UniProtKB/Swiss-Prot annotation:
This is Protein E7. The keyword Metal-binding applies. Highly phosphorylated. GO terms for cellular component: host cell cytoplasm; host cell nucleus. A motif (LXCXE motif) lies at residues 24-28. Plays a role in viral genome replication by driving entry of quiescent cells into the cell cycle. Stimulation of progression from G1 to S phase allows the virus to efficiently use the cellular DNA replicating machinery to achieve viral genome replication. E7 protein has both transforming and trans-activating activities. Induces the disassembly of the E2F1 transcription factor from RB1, with subsequent transcriptional activation of E2F1-regulated S-phase genes. Interferes with host histone deacetylation mediated by HDAC1 and HDAC2, leading to transcription activation. It is found in: Host cytoplasm; Host nucleus.
Length: 93
């Protein structure tokens, strides 16, 4: 643009591509969901503390699981799964 005021002749009316022959296709392969979960969440040890269903004493155990399995265990413990301590197990046999 020349001068203080823009003139019509100063405007560019042709659009030219800035990059020629740009390949926008992504050649990356995405793994299936089940493989991706294994890669993202490896099994780790978790300490679980729950009370005995009979005597209410604390029962401590360690499990090896991934994040989704721990969530499922938590749901089971909150709903229908009860843990029994070793002493109550021996007394009830």
């Amino acid at each position: 643009m020349v001068g203080e005021m823009p003139a019509l002749k100063d405007l560019v009316l042709q659009l030219e591509p800035s990059v020629l022959d740009l390949d926008l296709y992504c050649y990356e392969e995405v793994p299936p969901d089940d493989i991706e979960e294994e890669l993202v969440s490896p099994q780790q040890p978790y300490a679980v503390v729950a009370s005995c269903a009979y005597c209410e004493k604390l029962v401590r155990l360690t499990v090896l699981a991934d994040h989704s399995a721990i969530r499922q265990l938590e749901e089971l413990l909150l709903r229908s799964l009860n843990i029994v301590c070793p002493l109550c197990t021996l007394q009830r046999q």
